[in-house]
């Protein structure tokens, strides 16, 4: 391949530009042999496609909560509960993952199934206003804290087409350091994950309200200054939630299921938990869990979620406690960023897999979040059980026998 002048690199997504990029790169076959027309609006300089194999694991036996937001505060309210059996799609190339998740789901099903809960729903854009002095930054913070209701009304009354009516401002929190006033705009975004709509609305607030109405004139407005928890783990949102859905999953495994399905014992699982928790603390790990990102990334890839959000979404806190007749296992995902409308969920492949779980479209995002949490706990249970065997032989054998199969 001969390098092409960067200025001459075709950047459009029309047929001619796509073919020009493919020809210049010498690409053909599998990566270019599919119809790319559904993806022309998905990204810039579209050139080909990457196919990821998808397994379907299940059924997961889950008691799911039914939820809605109250108004005007946007608190998550449980309106009912129902049990369902769900098949979960996993897009990945990690040998052993699907089999392990299935084993965890089976152990849970034989013990009464999973139970899941949604505690909170927020997504944040953390702007920053750079002032001349600390005094001005404090004045600005006091002004913003006193005008939350006015800002909500101002945003709701805007009629510009680019401002979203679905991204609703719920809270405003300020953090002053030096001459900077960081402002955390907290939104709910309906069934969309919502990063684009809340970014537009945060920009409108910054430039149309704060810069125009504040008693001090900031020198600079920055739309995102890294306090928002976007696409990276952070202690703030691990501990308190607030960037994504805060979701819990639990199951009480019987001694029989642990012994017969997981091939280990409660004692061995608790020994692993003790050692693993100390290891997590010693390493400074943000999460207290085993392998949550594997399940979350696989579901995200199958269902058109933003893969950049796996980092935040896979922050996890797992627990295990001996109870009469078995062990109680719990998992908290404080920042699960998912959507069932918009973005990549509109692609045919994503729609198909979301529909398989009855999670496509409006009114489905809390169901989807709970299914992700249950599937993640299923993998945590099985992977932990394999590591808890003597010498972690089961974990070794799974990777030796299944992890190396690529052809």
Describe these PLM feature segments.
Residues 1-87, 100-102, 120, 398-407:
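Acidic/polar, glycine-rich intrinsically disordered N-terminal extensions of enzymes
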Residues 8, 361-407:
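Extended hydrophobic packing segments that form well-structured cores
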Residues 43, 57-61, 89, 126-132, ...:
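Short glycine-rich or small-residue beta-strand-to-loop segments that form or flank ligand, phosphate
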Residues 46-90, 189-199, 278-305, 375-385:
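Conserved phosphate/anionic-ligand binding catalytic regions in large, soluble enzymes, centered on
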Residues 48-179, 183-186:
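Small-residue-rich
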Residues 98-152, 232-274, 318-373:
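A structural-propensity feature for long, helix-poor, extended segments
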Residues 136, 150-183, 199-203, 207, ...:
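N-terminal loops that bind phosphate or other acidic moieties
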Residues 188-346:
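Glycine-rich anion/phosphate-binding loop at the beta-strand->alpha-helix junction
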């Amino acid at each position: 391949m001969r390098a092409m002048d960067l200025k001459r690199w075709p950047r459009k997504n029309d047929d001619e530009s796509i073919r020009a990029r493919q020809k210049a790169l010498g690409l053909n076959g599998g990566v270019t042999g599919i119809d790319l027309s559904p993806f022309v609006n998905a990204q810039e300089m579209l050139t080909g496609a990457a196919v990821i194999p998808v397994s379907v694991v299940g059924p997961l036996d889950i008691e799911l909560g039914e939820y809605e937001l109250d108004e005007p505060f946007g608190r998550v309210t449980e309106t009912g509960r129902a049990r369902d059996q769900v098949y979960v799609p996993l897009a990945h190339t990690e040998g052993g993952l699907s089999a392990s998740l299935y084993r965890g789901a089976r152990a849970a099903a034989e013990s009464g199934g999973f139970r899941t809960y949604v505690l909170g729903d927020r997504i944040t854009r953390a702007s920053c206003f750079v002032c001349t002095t600390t005094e001005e930054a404090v004045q600005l913070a006091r002004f913003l804290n006193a005008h939350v209701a006015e800002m909500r009304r101002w945003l709701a009354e805007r009629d510009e087409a680019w401002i979203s009516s679905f991204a609703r401002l719920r809270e405003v929190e300020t953090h002053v350091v030096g001459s900077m006033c960081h402002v955390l705009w907290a939104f709910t975004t309906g069934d969309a994950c919502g990063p684009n709509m809340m970014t537009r609305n945060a920009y409108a607030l910054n430039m149309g309200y704060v810069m125009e109405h504040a008693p001090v004139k900031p020198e600079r407005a920055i739309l995102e200054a890294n306090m928002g928890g976007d696409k990276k783990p952070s202690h703030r949102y691990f501990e308190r939630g607030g960037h994504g859905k805060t979701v819990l999953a639990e199951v009480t495994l019987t001694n029989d299921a642990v012994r017969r399905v997981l091939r280990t014992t409660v004692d061995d699982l608790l020994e692993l938990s003790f050692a693993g928790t100390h290891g997590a603390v010693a390493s400074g790990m943000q999460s207290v869990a085993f392998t949550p990102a594997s399940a979350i990334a696989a579901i995200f890839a199958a269902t058109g979620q933003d893969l950049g959000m796996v980092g935040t979404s896979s922050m996890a806190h797992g627990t295990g406690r001996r109870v009469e007749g078995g062990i109680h296992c719990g998992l908290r995902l404080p920042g699960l960023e998912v959507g069932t409308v918009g973005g990549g969920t509109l692609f045919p492949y994503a729609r198909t897999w979301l529909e398989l779980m009855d999670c496509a479209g409006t009114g489905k995002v809390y169901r989807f979040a709970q299914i992700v949490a249950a599937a993640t706990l299923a993998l945590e249970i099985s992977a932990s059980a394999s590591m808890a065997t003597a010498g972690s032989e089961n974990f070794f054998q799974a990777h030796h026998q299944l992890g190396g199969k690529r052809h």
